[in-house]
Amino acid sequence: MKYDLIIIGSGSVGAAAGYYATRAGLNVLMTDAHMPPHQHGSHHGDTRLIRHAYGEGEKYVPLVLRAQMLWDELSRHNEDDPIFVRSGVINLGPADSAFLANVAHSAEQWQLNVEKLDAQGIMARWPEIRVPDNYIGLFETDSGFLRSELAIKTWIQLAKEAGCAQLFNCPVTAIRHDDDGVTIETADGEYQAKKAIVCAGTWVKDLLPELPVLPVRKVFAWYQADGRYSVKNKFPAFTGELPNGDQYYGFPAENDALKIGKHNGGQVIHSADERVPFAEVVSDGSEAFPFLRNVLPGIGCCLYGAACTYDNSPDEDFIIDTLPGHDNTLLITGLSGHGFKFASVLGEIAADFAQDKKSDFDLTPFRLSRFQ
């Protein structure tokens, strides 16, 4: 049997692509080395931020606005436990922060609902937060956070119900191209399709070693926090930049536990075995202390944590491009620790590719050729 589309890697982007391509009427095979959602990639840990006024660059704003529309649509499948929670996101940092300047510029260019607060305004609205006098806050009222594992589970179930074939716990070991399309090799045999999407996350280089993607071990952890830090008390999700440039992110507390992580740093790794569990690297448990001590001093001790992996590109911008020499294979990789919020729209882009539709977005900034 020859499929219209084979998806290699069915985590965040792959799960979305499987659903949108199947819904469009294509004959699709989703594959994954594990059983998604799982703990081996970049999507576990329950929650991920979604920010609209994008500090990483204005080029992402059209993508994230479309992503938000798709998240809202997906959330309607889980109204009792919504996938998107509009908690708002407060971006904290020094007034001269380049990241915050980008946030402000994105908001201005796209007329986004962002409120600027000085240090006193921040602390008056959220007494739990402490910042120096030279800090500002840019509050995105329409942003919030996503339930990442629930989203993937929902997409996979919807795709299955729509007739998508799914081959999980079965790694793809090789990809071959010929005039008839794409063939993948697995322990279960070979499968063929007209087109393929490669969104295999951190270990994409096991299949395509020439790609400029660097795996980095990262951690996040949950700390004691009472109801003052909850959504019910209107405590927001947040990003925060310390004076030394370190970047942190976090979420409102749930069940008396507040999740926080450090975006920069981490440990470069070269195999899955090197991604050791949380607390096996000495700095894991204390990584968030500089932020907690200075910005959220009322937060208690570390309860537990987890390790995940970033698939970093050299400039930490996405790679969305066809495989060189093979226009029937689309790469979506190098998401560099800020990709989950875009999973919905990237899945839609993948489905459009499989249908020979031109993308509605300017994907030029994400081409591989920028590294040549």
UniProtKB/Swiss-Prot annotation:
It catalyses: N(alpha)-methyl-L-tryptophan + O2 + H2O = L-tryptophan + formaldehyde + H2O2. Keywords: FAD, Flavoprotein, Oxidoreductase. One of its GO terms (cellular component) is cytosol. Its EC number is 1.5.3.-. The keyword RNA-binding does not apply. Its cofactor is FAD. It is an enzyme of class 1 (oxidoreductase). The modification S-8alpha-FAD cysteine is found at C308. InterPro entries: FAD-dep_OxRdtase, FAD/NAD-bd_sf, Me_Trp_Oxase_MTOX, MTOX. GO terms for molecular function: flavin adenine dinucleotide binding; N-methyl-L-amino-acid oxidase activity; sarcosine oxidase activity. Belongs to the MSOX/MTOX family. MTOX subfamily. This is N-methyl-L-tryptophan oxidase. The gene is solA.
